[in-house]
Swiss-Prot record, chains A, B:
Its EC number is 3.1.-.-. Gene3D superfamilies: 2.70.180.20, 3.40.1350.10. GO terms for cellular component: cytoplasm. NCBIfam families: PRK04247.1 (NF003270). It holds the Pfam family NucS_C. It is found in: Cytoplasm. The gene is nucS1. This is Endonuclease NucS 1. It comes from the Archaea. InterPro entries: Endonuclease_NucS, NucS_C, NucS_N, NucS_N_sf, TonB_box_CS, tRNA_endonuc-like_dom_sf. GO terms for molecular function: DNA binding; single-stranded DNA endodeoxyribonuclease activity. The keyword Nuclease applies. Cleaves both 3' and 5' ssDNA extremities of branched DNA structures. Belongs to the NucS endonuclease family.
DNA sequence: GCCTAGGTCCCGTCT
DNA sequence: AGACGGGGCCTAGGC
């Protein structure tokens, strides 16, 4: 099913890639190339052997010798192929990104294949799962906590969980499924302030940050603002 | 130079990949596989044809049919290869990430190559370039602005540019080289508050957000807090 | 070592 | 369409 060329000429490789893309196949090119990105930010890749993947959604990624992220990429397309001066693959990534041009002086291997089925994924352990867990067992936040609404809207944005504590005090809960940083504290602070403005003037409002952990600076920020931290991890995570 | 196998058995592919990695080569495997990630977050990829890249830094990325990001990945290693039940590539990504296992029921193409030179990049148009531009022409921020220090430290973190406005008022400048969101406004707010606490009690402190543009909500946030927005783009960007 | 900030962030979701 | 927030974000730099 997959087709492969070894050491093709630029013309052959260009025709091969164009035909494969027209058939909805993924194209893998391995070879020596240079790349330039022109746009808001300018990036140039010196000559080196890399892997280019041209996916059926017209995403182009260029992977180098290290790292999870591609050395260069573009999506938004369309993708154009040219064989005038070596094989050149180009794609315009739109206004915010820029235009990518990859020029191969030698293609070692060109492969085209049908990426059938390569999409279905199942995920767990996200913030949504943490929310489900807290709604199922509100005492995890603190004993007596009662959720009343999720995504309750305020002028500062939607509150993850809105409810009352054991004393009946209005409480905003902000969820993070990873260790929380200062941004989470100020977001919670904005929600609490918005609730105080929204409710009648002398209303007491509490804020609780629910996350597996917080950074030291965030813990101080919370304390300074009279906010509470409650350690809860998403279900199924190893640290329980 | 690059070596290629077509439709190898699991044993052959495993030996091929192991040898290539030992030689510091990059390995590309194209074939039908399933993948599982176990850790804080659980992710499962159903059977599909994908590209696996095993890089010389022991990063493993698995690319599917769409998107810039890999469907699965691991780094931190070490990477292990096993041929007991189809070709299996595994890598432990550490505590926060999890362990990745990719099992191929069929390898269509296995390629190994030396990713020589695939590292050098030059970049421009970043926040650093915007800073250079502002330091070179401070009037871009506003007429009469005088930079005094960069990365000036405060309890809330380092201020991009610290200086005085035309009236001599202490001013904190926060730079963003892309359209700024609410996080930039609250970051600037934290810096201004920290400066007010640090300097003598009745000190006036201004805050200016310098970016090519801001979102509407951010513009309101800034106005509510008495902060200023000054539109400046990084040098060489298309919108000047 | 942890933590913070930047990114062509990407990507989903909602207005 | 733009906009906002989450992410196994990744990656570089600072302490």
């Amino acid at each position: 099913m997959p087709r492969t060329l070894t050491d093709p000429t630029a013309d052959r490789a260009a025709a091969f890639a164009t035909d494969a893309a027209a058939d909805g196949l993924t194209v893998s090119l391995i070879g020596s190339c240079v790349a330039t990105l022109t746009g808001r930010s300018q990036r140039d890749l010196a000559a080196g052997v890399r892997t280019l993947l041209w996916k059926p959604d017209d995403t182009v990624v260029v992977h180098g010798a290290s790292g999870r992220d591609p050395d260069a990429w573009a999506s938004g397309g369309p993708v154009t192929v040219d064989a005038a001066d070596g094989l050149t693959v180009a794609c315009d990534g739109g206004h915010t990104a820029g235009a990518l041009r990859v020029r191969f002086d030698a293609v070692h291997t060109a492969t085209a294949f049908d990426a059938a089925g390569a999409d279905a994924t199942t995920v767990s352990g996200t913030e949504a799962a943490l929310k489900d867990r807290v709604l199922d067992t509100p005492d995890l936040v603190e004993p007596g906590f009662q959720p009343l609404a999720t995504e309750r809207d305020t002028p500062a944005g939607p509150i993850d969980i809105y409810g009352r504590d054991a004393d009946g005090t209005v409480t905003a809960v902000e969820l993070k499924n990873v260790r929380a940083g200062p941004a989470a504290a100020s977001q919670l602070q904005r929600y609490v302030a918005a609730l105080r403005r929204t409710l009648h003037a002398d209303a007491t409002v509490r804020g609780i940050l629910v996350a597996p952990a917080v950074t030291a600076k965030t813990r101080r920020l919370l304390a300074d603002r009279g906010l509470t931290f409650s350690p809860v991890s998403p279900p199924g995570s190893r640290d329980r």
